[in-house]
């Protein structure tokens, strides 16, 4: 399998945050992946998100009992999936956004101090503009969240 010639060259793993920023458009406070630790072109990727107390969402979600919002866990899974899609062979460059979020389940709370291990597996890619991934978020070997995420290319 070849890598998209227009995409940045894939350096040696792990991919640091600076490399991830070269692949994804997200920036603070929505850059939610700190490192990519595993990557198989066109198939899967595994990333790390270190959850810290000084993140802005914890000011209001919830005072005295901070919990990472589920929507941000889903977004973090999607960003790991975005690494797969961005580096896929023959995939046009552009902005991929959510087209669907299916069968998402939250199994345990994610709190400051946790390390999310985010895995994304490519399920399908259609017409060079739609991709579906299966995402999982784990903390200490326990499933925190999972679901299917669908992306669409915005022109």
From Swiss-Prot:
Subcellular location as annotated: Cytoplasm
Main EC class the enzyme belongs to: lyase
Entry keyword set: Cytoplasm, Lipid A biosynthesis, Lipid biosynthesis, Lipid metabolism, Lyase
GO cellular component terms, semicolon-separated: cytoplasm; membrane
Predominant localisation class: cytoplasm
EC number(s) recorded for this UniProt protein: 4.2.1.59
Reactions accelerated catalytically: a (3R)-hydroxyacyl-[ACP] = a (2E)-enoyl-[ACP] + H2O
Stated role: Involved in unsaturated fatty acids biosynthesis. Catalyzes the dehydration of short chain beta-hydroxyacyl-ACPs and long chain saturated and unsaturated beta-hydroxyacyl-ACPs.
Family listed: Belongs to the thioester dehydratase family. FabZ subfamily.
HAMAP family: FabZ
Annotated protein name in UniProt: 3-hydroxyacyl-[acyl-carrier-protein] dehydratase FabZ
Lineage: Bacteria, Bacillati, Cyanobacteriota, Cyanophyceae, Synechococcales
Recorded name of the encoding gene: fabZ
């Amino acid at each position: 399998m070849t890598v998209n010639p227009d995409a940045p060259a894939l350096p040696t793993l792990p991919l640091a945050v600076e490399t991830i920023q070269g692949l994804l458009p997200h920036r603070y406070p929505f850059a939610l992946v700190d490192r990519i630790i595993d990557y198989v072109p066109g198939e899967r990727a595994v990333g790390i998100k270190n959850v810290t107390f000084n993140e802005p969402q914890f000011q209001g979600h919830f005072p005295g009992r901070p919990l990472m919002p589920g929507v941000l866990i889903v977004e973090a899974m999607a960003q790991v999936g975005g690494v797969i899609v961005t580096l896929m062979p023959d995939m046009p460059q552009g902005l991929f956004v959510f087209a669907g979020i299916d069968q998402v389940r939250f199994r345990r709370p994610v709190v400051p101090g946790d390390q999310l291990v985010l895995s994304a597996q490519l399920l399908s890619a259609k017409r060079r503009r739609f991709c579906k991934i299966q995402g999982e978020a784990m903390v200490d070997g326990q499933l925190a969240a999972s679901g299917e995420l669908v992306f669409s290319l915005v022109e």
